Amino acid sequence: MNQRPSMPTQTAPARKSISQSSQPLSSSTPVPAAGDGYSGIKEKSGSLHSIIEHVMTYTFPLLCAVNLYFAARELSWVSLAVVIILGVPIAWILADFVSGLIHWFADTYGADDTPLFGPWLIKPFRQHHLYARDICTHNLVLTIGNSCTGAAPLQVGLLYFLLSDDDVSITNAALAFVFNLFTMAMVATNVLHKWAHAEKTNWLVSRLQRSRVFLSPAHHHLHHTPPFDSNYCITNGWLNPLLERIRFFRNMEATLSAIGIKPNESSYAAVSLSRNLAPAKTDLREG
């Protein structure tokens, strides 16, 4: 295992509530105490939310496998090889872009109490700036449950598309295969994000982070520097330099502001402690 330097974040009071229900630490709770990027709170989904997360976490990969099969059976071996060679990087890049859009939206618009999106999307992202390593205490369901819940309906729609057409064209089969890879990459994004904050990872993950196949801690640190308004893409971060260079998100904000949709500065500034903190110290190992 590769030992990483500690990654303390900005000082903040221990939170009293989180997007899921929380409970105090006990001697048997394997969650680090407050400090060094941790809130000291064990996160646990509410009962109904937890049921949905568990069902979707285990349903999603089954749907992926079924859809990959039905898409692949319409392709020759040569076509399938071409689709995989071209489709994997396309899906990986597209997932990085969409992860950036979602992250930017959650950081910039709405509030903790925004219907539907507030509790399960906006609040967790913003609290993550204060307690960056809390994500490392999440089990698989807490890590990808919400992502699977959002992606599973897309897989159901894809399955209907593949089964409702008696003669799926090669083009449609190839697009379906790549779309499947894209949803898989989107679900994997929060795992890659979690690894970018982890104190320890195995040698393979560390190697893939250093080679920038996965999101690296050093690169992700750029987002965790106040005012937390850049480098939003968190699948691998490949698109961040380009999007920052063309001021993509600032231009998006200007466009939306022109039609009356303005960033929620008061809510976001409160979470980033008025954007006046010194940059958070994080893991700056090579990567």
Residue ranges of each PLM-predicted region?
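Cytosolic/stromal cytosol-facing helical appendages immediately following the last transmembrane segment
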Residues: 1-50, 81, 109, 113-116, ...
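The first (N-terminal) embedded transmembrane alpha-helix
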Residues: 49-70
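Core segments of transmembrane alpha-helices
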Residues: 57-64, 141-162
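Alpha-helical membrane-inserting segments
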Residues: 65-68, 94, 98, 102, ...
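Membrane-interface helix-loop junction between the first two transmembrane segments
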Residues: 71-82, 101-112
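Membrane-embedded alpha-helical segments that form the functional core of polytopic membrane enzymes
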Residues: 77-98, 172-188, 206-210
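Membrane-proximal helix-loop-helix units in multi-pass membrane proteins
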Residues: 153-178
